[in-house]
Amino acid sequence: MTSRMQPKSGVYSVSKADFTKIFEDVPKVPITSAVDLRNKFDAVRIILSNSSEDWNKRQTQLKTVRSLVIHGEKVVDRPTMIAHLVQLLGCFELAVKDLRSQVLREAAITCSFIVSKYGIETHSIGEDILVPAMSQVAVSTKIMATSASTLTEFIVEYVQTRQVFTILSSFSTSKDKSQRRQLAALLEIVISKWSDRIKKQIMRQICELIKSAINDADSETRAAGRRAFAKLDEMHSEEADALYLELDHSKQKMLRGGDAASSWASVNSEKGSIPIRSKLSAGSKAHMNISAKFLAQRSASAIDPKATKFAGPSRLVRPTSTKTMARQDTSPAGCKYSNFISMFFKTLLLSAKIPYPNRPGSRTRTSSITSTDSRDTSPTRRNSPLPPETQKARVKYGNGSFFAKLGMPDTTDDDEFLLPIRIRSPLKTPTIEAHDKVSQVLKECCSSSVSEKKEGIKKLLPIVADTSLNPIEIKNIGNCLNRLLSDASNTMVLEIYSIFVRTHSSRLSEWLRLALAKLFARKAAETLPNTKKQIGHTLNVILECFNAHHQLVTVCELMCDPIHLMVPKARVVLLEYLTSLLDEYTEPGASINAKELKTAIRKMLTWASDPRLSILLTPHVEKAICSMFCVNVADFSALISDLDSEQKNWIHQTLQRNGLENGISSNNIATNSGATASRETSNTSFQKESTSFGLPEFGARKGGTGVNLGSLNISNNLALSRLEEQSTSRLMEKVNLNSTVTLPPDTLEKIQNVQDLLQKMRSSENADEQESAISSIYMMICDGGFGVWEQCYAKLLLNLFEILSKSRSENNKKMCLRILGKMCTAQAAKLFDSTEMAVCKVLDAAVNTNDATTALAVEDCLRTLATHLPLSNIINIAKVILNQEPIDDERASLVLKMVTRLFEELPAEELNNIVDDITPTIIKAYQSTSSTVRKTVVYCLVAMVNRVGEQRMTPHFTKLPKAMTNLIQVYVNRAISTSLPRL
């Protein structure tokens, strides 16, 4: 009988090699024509989309997919085959999420086969299944975890997109150590396999993820992080050097140990004299010929292999006492003292043969060589034959105090052994001691000990005020202060920062850019008002002390830097700083016509046109543009001369809207005095202007189009009907408007192609033709080739709404839901007016289906709509649906899940304003007779407590039954306990 117990060696684990062997191990499926292939794919989709189907059938169908791909290439072309596979996207996602290990394994093999065969062309499949695959890595069943991890390796290797890297980055803070470990392993693939063009854009994020892995609490994750660092060092040595310097000393030592030599041959080889890149502490540049063996803190002979050529067979004899031991200087700098060494050369050679039994204090020693170790081949050590005066002189330059004068850390005997003998003039001692003091204080400031760091910061305060610091010391202090910004809660750090800037601003031009980047990021991440105010004071000091034009150019360069990718809140801080610089510290009429400013204006317009960030950034972008205009109208006109007409039109409208009535006129350029007056008008207008312009849709209509839900009767379905009518009327206005636009011929051709596809979408009689049109539009949107949003957006949206409401094809509904999500992500601002209608149509698609994959697509689409569209509109439609009498259980459950996602993903600052508005409605929904709705209400309330705090929600909980309050508290405590980091 075969035992059911499996050995611990991992019989059920799989690897990439196992997957590759099974790729084509599938039964042959005969395919006669393209229609036959499509019918077979439809049959596969029907079985895989049903999660309650027998798992053996689903496993067989996944093998059939591979067989269809292998044997269908002779029947259809490559794009058609990819279109068939994209239609199975929901099925693949459902299979990867399956709890049955056989189904998951087969799904992982099939998806790996697809992405390895078609690569970037199937990026939509790889991007969508990467998240569930990473989730399965955390499963305790080994076959499931290894199958999922192997699938992620295939996806990361063959689908090289920014979206894949963004998904991976989201798992860096996972509570599961298996996911963090897998992320570190995938980083090694990213570094070795991805193209340099993509890696250049994300190199800073890659380094941060490697740093996080090296500092992880899990030992295996740290080991994987070190392997990723080794690969980074191999492929991109400069970035590896910079990352190395950011690590703690203990982590540097771990990385350093891997680079060390481990044999006598490596120490004495010519390669041993090659300079090791800057992985040494300060002062290491004077010893660039040291072998890497000493960096691993191991002892070895000090005899230079080149010096032995001159010494011949005789070797220097060193004393046995460590207090009187002298070192031979083998560095180039030590050649100055060759005369000093030659004074004792003959005496040292004789001492190897002549004992001194009668010398006071001398001792004889016999040595026996019983080992072949390299250390035993060193010369026999005897007592020094030199006079006592000479011994004292040698002790002066050989003991530990010598290292303090060099500014080197006296950590081990090996470090002491590496240093040459240098006789310094007594006149230079004060300078050496001052340099040693600065180095020692900086070392304390970067210490991992909290108390030592605090003492170092206190000592640093008088040092930064010293005007006699040399350029190297100023550079080291500046770098140290930038690192200390992570502990900006210590107000003394910011005070030292301000003093340092005031004292040495004329010598910190190159340092300014990095300092501003650190300060912007720190202020954006800070939540304490007092600390944020202190950081603002430090920024004001920089504004006062540096040249205004130099600051302007530096800020614009930082804004466009592809390496320092700032988070949205940091961009807000940068724009506020830029506005203050232009308004308060730049003289009216000053020249601003520079290429850096022209690039910065383009970058600001890009930020403002991003639908995810427009609400946050657009008001600040408008302020910065108006401030530039007020400084020098003529230069500003020249800066925007290369922009397209739509961007110029938007800038002109922005200037008029903010009090600059004349805008930019080619016939009437304002004078400097007029610019000053305009600036005052602009500042006054900004205080009155609402900060929610939303979208820089260049040339788009800005009228108020909000839907007033307060007057709607929510006792029946009339509310939803009225919402749809208002949204539809606005859409029809856009359709009529777009039909009158004059366009160039190439754009007209694109529009005609899209119009033909839209017409096919409307023909519900031919389901196959409709499905083909939907697939074509979806592929165009995924590949970024749609390109005619302005003219076809409204018509496409109406077609999607009609299919979601009336179509009987579940596959068409799922494709339309994915298209709607892509449209919302790419052009969210165009969907603002139709928010309520979009949510209603998506809910209709969910209510009229029994397909599990359609339900998943509905939840994903609602999540996208909720996080990209106006928050007030989302809350209003949620209230309408939850307040219906009687409550629609299925719609209410989906809406509650949507609100839960809102509170899980959006920042607390945005959500605080809607808590009082939505909470009573959610609590009322708990009265539903459906257990599913009640459970969803509890999850939603728990998410609200976790995001805005228990104190904020307490007034609403007083109206709840005690049992429900206790239940919520249990879930909150459970969420808190699971969010704690694992040790």
Curated annotation (Swiss-Prot):
Residues 356-393, 666-690 are annotated as: Disordered. GO terms for molecular function: microtubule binding. HEAT repeats lie at residues 918-956. GO terms for biological process: astral microtubule organization; establishment of mitotic spindle localization; mitotic spindle assembly. The keyword Cytoplasm applies. GO terms for cellular component: basal cortex; cytoplasmic microtubule; kinetochore; microtubule organizing center; mitotic spindle; spindle microtubule. SMART domains: TOG. Residues 359-372 have a biased composition (Low complexity). Keywords: Cytoplasm, Cytoskeleton, Microtubule. Coiled coil: none annotated. It comes from the Eukaryota. Microtubule plus-end tracking protein that promotes the stabilization of dynamic microtubules. PANTHER family: CLASP, PROTEIN CLASP-3. This is Protein CLASP-3. It comes from Caenorhabditis elegans. The lineage of its organism: Eukaryota, Metazoa, Ecdysozoa, Nematoda, Chromadorea.
